[in-house]
A protein has these predicted regions:
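Short "repeat-start/strand-capping" segments in structured domains, especially the N-termini
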Residues: 1, 16-21, 36-42, 59-64, ...
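Extended, compositionally biased low-complexity polar/Lys-Gly-rich tracts
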Residues: 1-2, 67-71
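Hydrophobic lipid-interacting interfaces of membrane-associated proteins
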Residues: 6-8, 26-28, 47-51, 70-72, ...
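Short, T/G/N/S-enriched strand-turn elements that build extracellular solenoid repeat scaffolds
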Residues: 11-16, 31-37, 52-59, 76-81, ...
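GD-rich hexapeptide-repeat beta-solenoids
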Residues: 27, 42, 48, 65-66, ...
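Conserved small/polar residues in nucleotide/adenosyl-binding loops
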Residues: 151-153
Length: 153
């Protein structure tokens, strides 16, 4: 399923597809209290994405689920659950207070360490996680099923 729009409003709604869901919004993508579920992976591109109290799910185990968000991704109280091999966040701001990011894949959770530390909530992955930064203040729970390394540069 491909959705191209200026804005996408799925508040308390449902978007579901047996394969990949690609959503491109030049403005906001709002899934507050809603459900977006792909049988494949998720490719979400928007200026902002709000999933407060919502659920974003990618059930397929192959490929990469990607969240390329221009300004901010809000997953406060939400669940972002991805079985895709890789999960990548490309956003300058991430809020996950009371939220859960669960990655079941094994090819990597890609997230800027500064975003992870300040986001809050839980980040759980079956993948290895390697983090590097000059300084890190952690307000999140991070659980990795594989080797977890923290490198001070």
């Amino acid at each position: 399923m491909v959705v191209n729009a200026q804005a996408v409003d799925n508040r308390a709604g449902t978007l579901a597809a047996g394969g990949t869901i690609t959503a491109k919004a030049s403005n906001a993508l709002n899934n507050d209290g809603g459900l977006v579920e792909a049988g494949g992976h998720l490719d979400m591109q928007a200026d902002s994405l709000s999933n407060a109290g919502g659920r974003l799910r990618a059930l397929g185990s192959g490929g990469e689920s990607r969240f390329a968000i221009g300004t901010a991704l809000n997953n406060d109280g939400g669940v972002l659950e991805v079985a895709s091999a890789a999960l990548t966040f490309d956003t300058p701001a991430l809020s996950n207070r009371g939220g859960v990011v669960r990655h079941l894949g094994s090819a990597g959770l890609n997230l800027d360490m500064d975003l992870l530390g300040q986001a809050g909530g839980e980040f759980i992955t079956n993948s290895a996680v390697s983090l590097s930064a000059e300084e890190w203040v952690n307000n999140s729970l991070l659980q990795a099923a594989s080797i977890l390394s923290l490198i001070h540069i």
